[in-house]
């Protein structure tokens, strides 16, 4: 296959083993700032996916809470394939710390009593949320924390 412009289109989705967290890209700005983009893969590509209400609530919860653990977060957003998220950090390339930040954020999800910004004023599809769905996704991901380093299932 020809090399594509989008990094994830060059990833062989048939050989990765979810869950995992991998560095998906690095970009340096004109002034020396560096953005590191991580692929947080919750579900096995082409085998399973997150249901939209749970994914949507997980997005709100992670977007709000991850910033309590790092001031280096640029963005966190869901993948259209519904198997994971991308999180980008500026001037922060410590993979182990990124894992710690993700873990703390997932624990925040599990302790949440409501979904932030779950209303028509602050959300574009406020009817599509599930706190319980988000917690189920988060718990399954956290239960497999030992696998987050292992992108290709080599340790199994």
Swiss-Prot record:
The keyword Repeat does not apply. Its cofactor is Fe cation. The keyword Lyase applies. GO terms for biological process: quorum sensing. Its EC number is 4.4.1.21. Keywords: Autoinducer synthesis, Iron, Lyase, Metal-binding, Quorum sensing. Belongs to the LuxS family. Involved in the synthesis of autoinducer 2 (AI-2) which is secreted by bacteria and is used to communicate both the cell density and the metabolic potential of the environment. The regulation of gene expression in response to changes in cell density is called quorum sensing. Catalyzes the transformation of S-ribosylhomocysteine (RHC) to homocysteine (HC) and 4,5-dihydroxy-2,3-pentadione (DPD). This is S-ribosylhomocysteine lyase. It comes from Staphylococcus saprophyticus subsp. saprophyticus (strain ATCC 15305 / DSM 20229 / NCIMB 8711 / NCTC 7292 / S-41).
